[in-house]
Design a protein with these regions (language model features):
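Extracytoplasmic cell-surface/polysaccharide-interacting catalytic and binding patches
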Residues: 1-235
Length: 235
């Protein structure tokens, strides 16, 4: 009986030891991943021009970037060449791929946003297309699922482009292929699937943001949104 009891005690002790070892292994793996993440972190700062954050949580006044025109769409002149190259590569995937939107001033965004709100209120909107009127509060909630208030849109940076092979968005069979090549030209899909908690915006397969080659590569490899990436960088 004593031997059985002792064995039982030994077995229990081993189980606890195994559990501790497994926990230690998981902690070690997690730590290793964090070390690896920081080890290949680009030499970048939160204040870099191509990493500026504009959102409902981080609104900005008019930024007045120097603009250039690519295929009829205005963008920050510093990314014009990258936009042209990215578009050309995307058109190799789908010849119908085209730029839909680029830079928008704060005043332009305000007019656009208010027109969307009015359309939703009248029942002629993207979400409320029933023909039945709704309150302004309801309309604003609807609009914020697909458009941002003035001072909260990345388009005012001149670093964001909307690009698709169709004008009815989130329906392209080529979208994932285009998103996959984006980092080669310094772009990331700004609002990917499963990241609404981080960005505040649902999946948009057409909205690309220029962040620079090294940043785009790192963000893609580590599945990071701009919000998550900036937290890893010094000010």
């Amino acid at each position: 009986l004593l031997i059985i009891g002792a064995l039982g005690f030994i077995l229990i002790t081993n189980d606890k030891s195994n559990s501790t070892n497994e926990s230690a292994k998981k902690t070690s793996i997690s730590s290793s991943k964090e070390v690896a993440k920081k080890k290949d972190l680009p030499d970048a700062k939160q204040s870099d021009w191509d990493l500026v954050l504009v959102s409902r949580k981080s609104p900005k006044d008019e930024m007045n970037p120097t603009l250039a025109t690519v295929n009829g769409i205005q963008v920050d002149q510093r990314i014009a060449s990258a936009v042209q190259q990215f578009l050309a590569a995307a058109q190799q995937i789908s010849p119908a791929e085209h730029l839909i939107s680029g830079y928008r001033s704060v005043s332009y965004q305000e007019g656009l946003y208010q027109s969307y709100v009015q359309a939703e209120m009248n029942g002629q909107g993207t979400v409320n297309s029933s023909g039945n009127p709704i309150s302004e509060e309801e309309a604003i909630k609807n609009v914020q699922t697909y458009s941002q208030p003035p001072r909260s849109s990345e388009h005012q940076t001149g670093l964001a482009i909307d690009m698709s092979n169709i004008d009815s968005l989130n329906e392209s069979q080529y979208a994932k292929q285009v998103a996959a090549i984006a980092p080669k030209y310094g772009f990331v899909l700004r609002f990917p699937e499963g990241k609404k908690a981080e960005t505040g915006i649902g999946y948009e397969d057409w909205h690309f943001r220029y962040v620079g080659l090294e940043n785009a590569k790192y963000m893609t490899e580590h599945n990071l949104t701009l919000e998550e990436y900036l937290k890893l960088l010094p000010a």
